[in-house]
Amino acid sequence: MDDMQMRTWAEVDLSDLEHNYRALRGLLPRDCRFLGVVKANAYGHGAVPVAKRLEALGAEYLAVACLEEAGELRGAGIQTPILILGATPAADAPRLLELEVTQAVGDLETAQALSRAAQAAGKRLKVHLKADTGMSRLGFLCDETHLSRAAEEMARAAVLPGLEAEGIFTHFADADGDEAYTMRQFTRFLDLLGVLERR
């Protein structure tokens, strides 16, 4: 390393990552799958080495922010399923299909566009439906006023031809801060699941 150009660096001990993975895995029910978030270069810790270690440990899924990050992992030989948490334009659907990654979908229009693109390619694209329970970024809006509409649109998105809806998730806006707000988001998510289960 050239000290004149790189004045800071991080040394990541992957055995500590392994310890943390095993500790978290031990807290989960046996039928719960583990998704390791490695977006933003694994938060500065090195996406490829972290993803490779998580893959070797048996993590069932990895998550990244964007298509480029997914491409980096696939290019490094990572075979574990990858979820793209951010939005990807339908024009990039051929690359999603080529990489065999899963795309988060936060609105019906995007789902429909991805459906058309997947059908045109003669393939199926895996998607996870994202519920906006209070992050106010990406997702089907699931506050008390929009819950019914969100459930209806998610149900429609889940059965679009060319798509394989394999999951649903939300993003807690302040999970390590405002516990009351996090619980409100969690309640909204459970309410949404209840509405969807009754459909």
Residue ranges and their predicted role:
Residues 27:
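Conserved PLP-enzyme active-site core in the AAT-like
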Residues 1:
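Short, basic/glycine-rich phosphate-binding loops at helix/coil junctions
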Residues 21:
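Short-chain dehydrogenase/reductase
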Residues 4, 8-11, 18, 32-199:
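Active-site-proximal beta-alpha core segment in soluble small-molecule metabolic enzymes
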Residues 24:
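Active-site anion-handling motifs in enzyme catalytic cores
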